[in-house]
């Protein structure tokens, strides 16, 4: 999907560093940083099911970010992953499982564990408590990479006002809540809506894509 949006994924660490400095965003393709991931990729693809690498991948972030929002596919992983992130130096973060999805979800309640300076706080997050509506899996379903790229652009351009937009508001709102001092989660969701409605989010996406293209040519 990112490639359909114009993002170049196969950048070197030095190229990604320039993109990050310019835009505040970069995509770190695991196989480019952890050679073992490249070796096992064909096996993982052939198996067609989750493996230990679905758990290890998010924990091997080469950026060593101290703030992270991490989704897991099973509720039983929420607390262990939060503990590992804290042990790895994450001082502000959240691990979330949304009704079997590895992200915050509008399908139902979300089991989360918030990380703040070594303290782990588990709780359930109900989207309806933040003005968001519950939905079905079908309402969130995407399609091909090309179709998903168009859905993304429609949301960021304000043409999509349904469940998919609210799913983005929830997840982006959590990230803003974690990353900006003094915000409540409700503030984060409101801020996410403002950034989309103002066109700032779409402009950032376009600038990010352009920056990766420029870096690839340099």
Predicted regions and their residues:
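Glycine-rich anion-binding loops and their surrounding alpha/beta cores
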Residues: 3-10, 15-218
């Amino acid at each position: 999907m990112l490639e359909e949006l114009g993002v170049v994924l196969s950048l070197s660490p030095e190229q990604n560093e320039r993109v990050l400095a310019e835009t505040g965003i970069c995509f770190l393709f695991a196989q480019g940083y952890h050679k073992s991931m490249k070796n096992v990729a064909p096996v993982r693809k052939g198996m067609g099911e989750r493996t230990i690498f679905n758990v290890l991948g998010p924990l091997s972030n080469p950026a060593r970010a101290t703030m992270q929002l991490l989704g897991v596919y099973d509720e039983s992983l929420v607390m262990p992953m939060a503990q590992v992130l804290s042990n790895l130096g994450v001082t502000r973060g959240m691990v979330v499982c949304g009704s079997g999805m590895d992200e915050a979800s509008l399908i139902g309640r979300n089991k989360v564990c918030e990380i703040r300076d070594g303290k782990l706080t588990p709780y359930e997050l109900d989207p309806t408590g933040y003005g968001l509506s519950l939905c079905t899996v079908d309402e969130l379903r995407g399609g091909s990479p090309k179709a998903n790229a168009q859905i993304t652009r429609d949301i960021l351009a304000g043409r999509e006002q349904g469940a998919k937009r609210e799913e983005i508001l929830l997840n982006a709102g959590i990230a803003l809540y974690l990353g900006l001092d003094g915000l409540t989660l409700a503030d984060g969701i409101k801020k996410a809506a403002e950034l989309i409605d103002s066109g700032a989010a779409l402009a950032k996406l376009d600038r990010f894509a352009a920056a990766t293209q420029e870096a690839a040519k340099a």
